[in-house]
């Protein structure tokens, strides 16, 4: 994502997509959803539920990623945490005292998942190679080389968008690309005549990832 967008965060894209849906669908509900996301809604605690150190997204991905990776350290009692939530008189999310240990376990679980899964050397190595593939593809397209890719991916590779470039056309192309598209082109690019691109794609698809080396501080 960062290779396609320059200085544009995932949240920026989310807001633009929501506003696009708001224009298409209309209605007060969609407008309220955008206001909550941008923290403009008068009930401020609703924004905390979707964007904070203990929001619904984090509660979801810890359990989900624990299940799919087999790392049991990320399992948290989300039902218990939600049950202990309440709203203070000044409109902030707070927790009952008896829910303290559940919140503490969530914090520890999140830290453990970062060390064991999200910052694992294999995950970082694969991410490094994937970003290198996109950067190399962008360089080759700038040089005029033709690479096999879906039209929407070619559109994204041919320009690195700034915030001012994110219009409806860009969003349409951006949202039409999914993981299967990326894996498909990575496998096709193995056979390209550019050595760097071919090498990186082969390394990722055949799981020949770079080795990690610890350096002294």
Please tell me what each predicted stretch does.
Residues 2-217:
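Histidine-centered, transition-metal-coordinating active-site segments
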């Amino acid at each position: 994502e960062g290779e396609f967008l320059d200085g544009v965060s995932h949240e920026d894209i989310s807001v633009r997509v929501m506003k696009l849906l708001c224009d298409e669908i209309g209605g007060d509900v969609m407008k309220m959803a955008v206001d909550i996301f941008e923290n403009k809604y008068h009930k401020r605690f609703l924004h905390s539920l979707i964007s904070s150190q203990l929001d619904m997204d984090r509660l979801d991905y810890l359990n989900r990623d624990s299940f799919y990776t087999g790392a049991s350290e990320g399992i948290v009692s989300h039902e218990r945490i939600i049950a202990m939530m309440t709203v203070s008189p000044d409109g902030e999310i707070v927790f009952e005292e008896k829910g303290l240990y559940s919140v503490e376990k969530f914090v520890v679980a999140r830290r453990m998942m970062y060390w064991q899964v999200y910052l694992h050397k294999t995950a970082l190595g694969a991410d490094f190679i994937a970003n290198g593939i996109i950067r190399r593809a962008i360089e080759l397209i700038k040089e005029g080389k033709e690479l096999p890719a879906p039209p929407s991916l070619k559109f994204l590779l041919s320009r690195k968008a700034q915030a001012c470039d994110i219009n409806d056309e860009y969003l349409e192309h951006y949202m039409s690309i999914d993981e299967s598209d990326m894996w498909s082109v990575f496998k096709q690019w193995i056979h390209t005549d550019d050595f760097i691109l071919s090498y990186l794609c082969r390394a990722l698809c055949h799981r020949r990832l770079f080795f990690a080396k610890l350096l002294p501080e």
